[in-house]
């Protein structure tokens, strides 16, 4: 099984507002970068979409080390999602889970991979996180996509 590193970040100019994702995928000496922009979205949706896009780039089951500065994404996929599924997608206080569409998609994407989730402190000089941040901001400043599933509060 191939071992890959995926670095992700999301950005939003206003929250809600235009948003973007940045992804760096590394396999051996190969590297691929992705920047995408969305017209109207939130920061959390961009963090989730960045991870989904990174995993979507993989053509086969892989050992993945995934780096993100989003505690929301990391806690959601490694802890909270199990309770959400059991409670029919309700939070502990009985409210509907936000971004359910993306959580379902992310949950689907992780099933064939072995993933080690790594949190990195944002804006702390972590090289790949800074690249992803730049790619995400580039996308947010040049949106071309609709964030299908986004629902204004």
From Swiss-Prot:
It comes from the Bacteria. PANTHER family: RIBONUCLEASE H1. Residues 1-141 form the RNase H type-1 domain. Mg(2+) 2 binds at residues 9, 133. Binds 1 Mg(2+) ion per subunit. May bind a second metal ion at a regulatory site, or after substrate binding. The lineage of its organism: Bacteria, Pseudomonadati, Pseudomonadota, Gammaproteobacteria, Pasteurellales. GO terms for molecular function: magnesium ion binding; nucleic acid binding; RNA-DNA hybrid ribonuclease activity. Keywords: Cytoplasm, Endonuclease, Hydrolase, Magnesium, Metal-binding, Nuclease. Endonuclease that specifically degrades the RNA of RNA-DNA hybrids. It is found in: Cytoplasm. Its cofactor is Mg(2+). This is Ribonuclease HI. It catalyses: Endonucleolytic cleavage to 5'-phosphomonoester. It comes from Haemophilus ducreyi (strain 35000HP / ATCC 700724). Mg(2+) 1 binds at residues 9, 47, 69. Belongs to the RNase H family. NCBIfam families: PRK00203.1 (NF001236). GO terms for cellular component: cytoplasm. Signal peptide: none annotated. Monomer. Disulfide bonds: none annotated. GO terms for biological process: DNA replication, removal of RNA primer. Its EC number is 3.1.26.4. Gene3D superfamilies: Ribonuclease H-like superfamily/Ribonuclease H.
């Amino acid at each position: 099984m191939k071992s890959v590193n995926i670095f992700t970040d999301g950005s939003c100019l206003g929250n809600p507002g235009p948003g973007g994702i940045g992804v760096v995928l590394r396999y051996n000496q190969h590297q691929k970068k992705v920047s995408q922009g969305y017209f109207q979205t939130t920061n959390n949706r961009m963090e989730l979409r960045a991870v989904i896009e990174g995993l979507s780039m993989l053509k086969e089951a892989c050992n993945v080390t995934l780096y993100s500065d989003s505690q929301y994404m990391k806690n959601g996929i490694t802890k909270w999602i199990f309770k959400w599924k059991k409670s029919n997608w309700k939070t502990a206080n009985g409210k509907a889970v936000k971004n359910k569409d993306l959580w379902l998609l992310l949950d689907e994407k992780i099933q064939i991979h072995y993933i080690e989730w790594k949190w990195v402190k944002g804006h702390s000089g972590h090289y790949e996180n800074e690249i992803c941040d730049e790619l995400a901001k580039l996308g947010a400043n040049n949106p071309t996509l609709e964030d299908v599933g986004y629902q204004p509060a």
